[in-house]
Each structure stands twice: as C-alpha cells, then as structure tokens.
Amino acid sequence: MLLSQNAFIFRSLNLVLMVYISLVFGISYDSPDYTDESCTFKISLRNFRSILSWELKNHSIVPTHYTLLYTIMSKPEDLKVVKNCANTTRSFCDLTDEWRSTHEAYVTVLEGFSGNTTLFSCSHNFWLAIDMSFEPPEFEIVGFTNHINVMVKFPSIVEEELQFDLSLVIEEQSEGIVKKHKPEIKGNMSGNFTYIIDKLIPNTNYCVSVYLEHSDEQAVIKSPLKCTLLPPGQESESAESAKIGGIITVFLIALVLTSTIVTLKWIGYICLRNSLPKVLNFHNFLAWPFPNLPPLEAMDMVEVIYINRKKKVWDYNYDDESDSDTEAAPRTSGGGYTMHGLTVRPLGQASATSTESQLIDPESEEEPDLPEVDVELPTMPKDSPQQLELLSGPCERRKSPLQDPFPEEDYSSTEGSGGRITFNVDLNSVFLRVLDDEDSDDLEAPLMLSSHLEEMVDPEDPDNVQSNHLLASGEGTQPTFPSPSSEGLWSEDAPSDQSDTSESDVDLGDGYIMR
C-alpha cells in the first residue's frame, strides 16, 4: 500500500494555511453560537471508505433527522450540504466521494432537527492524515488439514490518496501462541486478497485477526477473531498402517537374525568353547581405552652408610711354641694361587687346637674391627679322650666316627676367633712343592717338619708307625718321611672330596681332614 508522495509535504503546509485563513478571513457565512459543543465526531477509514460518525453528549435530546455541511478551509467558500447526508436518520455519513484529498483541512457542521425545529448545531475541523483512524477490513477464513486460507475484501476502486502509508497485518493465535504475518501487496489495495497460513497442525483450533497498521504507530483497531478447527489429516490412517507395517518388518528381521545366530552356535561355527589364553581374553575390551592407573608404589627413605674395613691376613702358623709377634704374610705364586705354609702337628696338638677354637668367645667374630688380644689357650693333656679315641683301631673309628667340633656354617668362613682359622682343604687341588733355601730364609717362622714329631704307634703292631706329616696330591693322600728340607703347602680355597681315602689322616667322619 502506497502513500501519496505529496501527503507529507502538504500536511504541514495546510496546517499553517488553515490557521492563517481562520485568523484573517474568518468564516463568510452566518452561523449560530457554537461555543457550547454538544457533539462528538469521529472520522475513520472503514474498508477504505471515509466514514464520519457522531454522537450526542446530551442523550435527552433526540433529533428526528440530521443534516451535514462542510467546506474546505483553504478555499473561501460557503458551506455545502452533503447530498447523501441531508435529512438523514443515520448517525454516520460516507464522505469518500466528497473528501478526496488527504492533505486538506475540512470544516464540518452538523445540525439536528426535530420536525422543522433545530435542536442543536455543532462543528468540528478535520485533518484526514492525523484524525483518521483505520478500521480493519472485512475478511473470511477457510480451514484445511494443515493450512488456512485468509481472504481479505477490499473495495474494487480505492483512491491512492486514501491508502496512506498502511500495511496489512494477519495475526494467528493458537493455544496462547500469537504469530504475525505481514503479506506484501503489490499495487493498490483493490479487490479481494488471499493469503495462506501454512505449516499448521491438523485437528487443532486456530483463530485469525486482520487489521491495518500505520507507520506512525497509531493505535490500531483489530478485527474480531475468527476461529476454525482444522480437520484431522486424511493420511493419518495410512500413516498408522505404515507404522504398523514397519514394526512388523523390524520384528521379522530381528527374528531371522536371532534364529540364524542360534543355528550357527548350535552347529559350532561360532561361539566355540575353547579356552583361549589370557592374552586373547576380550571380556574387558571396553575397559581397554580407559585403563586403570597402576597402584602407587610404597616409597621408603633409605640411608646408605659406607664402612671401609681392611681385610685381615691371618697367621696360619699353629706352632704354640712360637711367641714372636711377627706374622708371616701369605705369598702369591705366579699362577694366581695364594700360598700358605702349614705345619702338621701331632694328634694331641691338633685336638687341642680344635678344642681351643670352641672355647673362644663368639663375640670376637662379630667384632672384627676391635683390637685383637692374644689369649693363651690351655694345652690338651697327652692322654685326652680325643687321643684315646683316635688311637683306637680302624674298625672302632668306623663304628663311632668323631663329630665335627665346628658347625657346617663355619666351613665357608675364612676368619676364626682369636687370630686362628679353620678351613677345609680339597686334596685334589692341593699343590706341594719343596721350599728352597731362599724361601726358607725369607719366612720368619720356618715351616719345616720337626724331627721330634710324635709318632702314632699301634700297641698291637709296634712296627707300624704313622707319621703325622701328610702330603696331599691330586690322586689322594700318602704318608711321607720326615725330611728337614720338605714342607707341605695347601690351598685354602677348595673343599675336600677324597680325604677319607687315607687312614693315616685324622678322620672327622664327614670326609674332611682336621688341620
């Protein structure tokens, strides 16, 4: 809907002109006193027709007919009687054919008569662009399944100046929800106009209202609501049947898949009951992408204390008669062996040595760093029980072998208490050599076999004399004759395996020789 291009321009011009004419020229006709207004006028555009309506303030006055007169303020003319509104009984008058210009100011006079007597006369000035209100047009609605057709009725011929700057608004209401539709109208508002409101819900009640909205945001007059209930969709039955068919199809497909899986499992193609290794166990496969964090390890503070201890070299000289404080250091051969000089003692002295090692306080082993104290050990008497038992026959020794005075855990120990040491010697790994004169001179205590060594004499066979000096070889043990230039040397690192092959050794009952 288009507004006349000159409407806004002439609006202010006509207002100024109207004031000027009223002040200078006045009104050229005689009229009664209108100081006491008794009428209320209203100009409106009803279905694009300019309709002037009035109402009397004093309801006690009841005229029988009315006569309407008007003049244009910009023209010095007398009042003219509106032909279709002379001696009318209606309280309104159609001025569409009389008031064609919207930019003019009109002066109207209304006279009320009762017979030939004038009851009242009132006047009012109108500016159509300002004083005119816009009533909604007539319309009809037709409801369908999901849309509504709105048909707006306009007059066949509408003056362009009466269209002003108007827009058509169609308002849709449903369940408290209001939607506005502003259709675009091309050209003049003439004839019937149809608008379709679509995307509606079937079987739902909708109400429609139509009105005209001015650009000046004047108060609008809405038409009464016209409601319609949309019929239910005709495709509802087919849609329900389609849903039922889809449900049945899905059920049949699920039944076929289930029966196929059960058959394959019964035949043995799937779900075999073979125990798989733990690596192929996929029961917790879903938990693999999110593994649990390993438990935290317990941490304790440890203080490391380094203690440097010097390795002691013990004197393996078992000669009790030597009281010298000097010690003979072990000698190392070129082959990597450690040589220790051993002095073979009589049986009585060997037994005494074993007894003395047992009498030593065990606390001396636990505190090797303490200074050593020379302890004078008692000597074993000649006729000790160990001697008597060793002097018995071979058969008696086999029946009651001597008990090892040292526990098994001491065999691997290289340190003894009181500056003495007890170790086992493997005769297969013992190397014997005769010391030269230079070697004998270097040693502080010569390891030569004494000619005064006691000999073991069997009372039954006095001719059988065994010497206490034994030499070990790789094949076994054999007695040797005492010689001033010969010494017996053994290695201290290897255990003994064949010490029980010779009867001349001191048999302890477990295959080792006590030295």
Swiss-Prot record:
It comes from the Eukaryota. Changing M73V: No effect on activation of STAT1 upon IFNA2 or IFNG binding. GO terms for biological process: cell surface receptor signaling pathway; cell surface receptor signaling pathway via JAK-STAT; cellular response to interferon-beta; cellular response to virus; defense response to virus; response to interferon-alpha; response to interferon-beta; response to virus. Glycans are attached at N58, N87, N116, N188, N192. InterPro entries: FN3_dom, FN3_sf, Ig-like_fold, Interferon/interleukin_rcp_dom, Type-II_Cytokine-TF_Rcpt. The modification Phosphotyrosine is found at Y337, Y512. Isoform 3 is detected in the urine (at protein level). Expressed in blood cells. Expressed in lymphoblastoid and fibrosarcoma cell lines. The keyword Cell membrane applies. Residues 362-375 have a biased composition (Acidic residues). Residues 1-26 form the signal peptide. Changing S324N: No effect on activation of STAT1 upon IFNA2 or IFNG binding. GO terms for cellular component: extracellular region; extracellular space; plasma membrane; receptor complex. Together with IFNAR1, forms the heterodimeric receptor for type I interferons (including interferons alpha, beta, epsilon, omega and kappa). Type I interferon binding activates the JAK-STAT signaling cascade, resulting in transcriptional activation or repression of interferon-regulated genes that encode the effectors of the interferon response. Mechanistically, type I interferon-binding brings the IFNAR1 and IFNAR2 subunits into close proximity with one another, driving their associated Janus kinases (JAKs) (TYK2 bound to IFNAR1 and JAK1 bound to IFNAR2) to cross-phosphorylate one another. Belongs to the type II cytokine receptor family. This is Interferon alpha/beta receptor 2. It comes from Homo sapiens.
